[in-house]
């Protein structure tokens, strides 16, 4: 099937690979895609609701920057990629139109060799899918564990290499929790697949956007929201102890716009800046509803 969704039967889960669109279970990639044996690629993901891809330009900024940092010569313009992604949205008929849209590129399909393939002969591959997922409801509270951050030092690139996060999430599940707060030494970095921020004495505190954390779109939106509301913000590395003593601990991601963390390593945390937290949370949701043309 072509990238155009006209004539494509509405699907509960939609997949795409290099120009072919169809039911996700029927889409496959070659065994020699460099994503398979090297994880040689990058990705991005965001939420879809009401036929709108949320914060797409922000996600494109991050995706194209990841391609640049990995030296992947991604061949599609932003306009072309947007058209491809919206073809999935138009073909999607699952979960009342709500879902998570994921796309990734790899350095192409070639025999296994650590060296980059010849760019004149091998083009990057593009894979995408849209599947049902609900946003975390506003009232959901998260329980987490803490773990030493053993990831490499390119966390600002949204690469396909996520084994430390996979292992960490499994450990969280086995501990009866939903997420992990990483730390390097005694300094908090981020979470396995989310950002963490803090309300401390009326200020929104977050980790500086350096190579130790992913520049999360949701946290960036929350920072802008705080500034609009006159809430001070500060980029600062804080210790695990300072995090545990924060007035509020906040989790943000593409699937969790702004939620509370209420327990870390089975110890109750936060809950000391209720009014300010809900002010930020309500504003984050209002922005989402307006952007997706529901308000």
What residue ranges belong to the model's regions?
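Short secondary-structure capping/junction motifs at helix and strand boundaries
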Residues: 90-102, 139
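Short, glycine/charge-rich beta-strand/loop segments that flank catalytic centers
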Residues: 77-86, 98-112
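Helix-start/capping segments and mature chain N-termini
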Residues: 7-90, 115-295
């Amino acid at each position: 099937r072509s990238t155009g969704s006209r004539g494509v039967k509405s699907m509960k889960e939609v997949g795409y690979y290099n120009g072919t669109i169809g039911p996700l279970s029927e889409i496959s990639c070659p065994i020699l895609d460099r994503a398979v044996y090297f994880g040689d690629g990058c990705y991005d993901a965001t939420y879809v609701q009401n036929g709108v891809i949320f914060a797409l330009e922000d996600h494109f900024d991050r995706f194209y920057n990841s391609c640049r940092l990995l030296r992947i010569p991604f061949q599609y313009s932003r306009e072309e990629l947007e058209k491809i992604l919206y073809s999935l949205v138009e073909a999607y008929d699952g979960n009342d139109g709500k879902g998570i849209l994921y796309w990734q590129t790899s350095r192409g399909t070639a025999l296994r060799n650590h060296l980059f393939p010849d760019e004149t002969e091998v083009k990057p591959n593009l894979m995408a899918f849209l599947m049902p997922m609900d946003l975390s409801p506003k009232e959901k509270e998260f329980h987490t564990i803490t773990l030493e951050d053993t990831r490499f030092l390119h966390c600002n690139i949204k690469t396909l290499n996520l084994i430390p996060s996979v292992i960490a999430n499994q450990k969280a599940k086995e501990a009866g929790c939903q997420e992990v707060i990483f730390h390097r030494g005694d300094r908090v970095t981020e979470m396995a697949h989310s950002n963490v921020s803090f309300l401390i004495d009326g200020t929104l505190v977050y980790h500086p956007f350096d190579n130790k954390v992913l520049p999360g779109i949701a946290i960036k939106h929350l920072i802008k929201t705080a500034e609009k509301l006159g809430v001070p913000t500060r980029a600062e590395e804080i210790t695990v102890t300072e995090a545990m003593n924060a007035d509020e601990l906040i989790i943000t991601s593409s699937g969790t716009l702004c939620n509370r963390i209420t327990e870390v390593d089975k110890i109750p945390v936060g809950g000391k800046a209720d009014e300010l937290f809900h002010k930020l949370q309500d504003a984050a949701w209002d922005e989402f509803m307006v952007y997706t043309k529901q308000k």
